[in-house]
Design a protein with these regions (language model features):
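Extended ligand-binding regions for polar small-molecule ligands
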Residues: 50-72, 146-186
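A ligand-binding cleft/hinge motif common to bilobed small-molecule-binding domains
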Residues: 5, 19-31, 76-83, 101, ...
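Ligand-binding clefts/hinges and TM-proximal coupling segments of bilobed small-molecule sensing domains
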Residues: 72-94, 130, 134-135, 165-194
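Hydrophobic residues within well-ordered alpha-helices
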Residues: 10-11, 45, 60, 107-108, ...
Length: 194
């Protein structure tokens, strides 16, 4: 099911939960409740591996950025803008794309200077294509990935959060994080986010 269709179906009550690593945003929290977080969603910039001119947040000033339309990437831009302002810089041209693979294609081909993504997505593409992409610095504060339930479905929210708590206590959550994300996230909130 397409991403936007999944969100609409959950909001309409067609589904009880979206068990996928959804990034929590203020807008999403207005419509959905989130199970206890399963991973970090701090955003980092990703650059071309051969472009050594982009080493710090300050170096991003005035550069062309690609983001996915309607995404958490777009929602994190005010944080990036504030970080740039602290260095005396400004947010450059922002190009919105329908999907993340298109952003990476244009970044690889030099049509963009950088893109931003959560640590999981950023590390994944850098690991898969280290000669093409390189990981930059954080461009946002803390953020989280979690499963969504319809707003007010407290029974399901607590049930799924209890499952995550058991996984955390047993060490299985850290094992799965290491296996799939390349690192464990020990500093996540331990309660649902509503």
């Amino acid at each position: 099911i397409p991403w936007t269709g999944m969100l609409a179906a959950l909001a309409a009550g067609k589904y009880d939960a979206a068990v996928t690593g959804t990034i929590m945003t203020e807008d999403r929290l207005k419509a959905y409740d989130f199970v206890t977080p399963i991973a970090s969603a701090t955003h980092y910039f990703v650059r071309r591996a051969g472009d050594n001119s982009l080493q710090s947040v300050a170096d991003l000033s005035g550069k062309t950025l690609g983001v996915q339309a309607g995404s958490a990437q777009l929602a994190r831009l005010p944080e990036l803008k504030a970080l740039l302002a602290q260095t005396g810089g400004t947010l450059g041209k922002v190009v919105e794309y329908p999907s993340t693979p298109e952003i990476y294609a244009d970044l690889a081909n030099g049509r963009l200077d950088y893109m931003i993504n959560s640590i999981i997505g950023a590390q994944s593409v850098v690991k898969e294509r280290p000669k093409v992409f390189a990981l930059g610095q954080p461009v946002s504060g803390a953020g989280y990935h979690g499963w969504m339930v319809a707003k007010g479905n407290t029974d399901l929210l607590n049930y799924l959060s209890g499952f995550i708590a058991q996984m955390r206590t047993s060490g299985r959550l850290a094992e799965l994080q290491n296996k799939w994300f390349g690192q464990a996230f020990d500093d996540l909130p331990t309660t649902p986010v509503t």
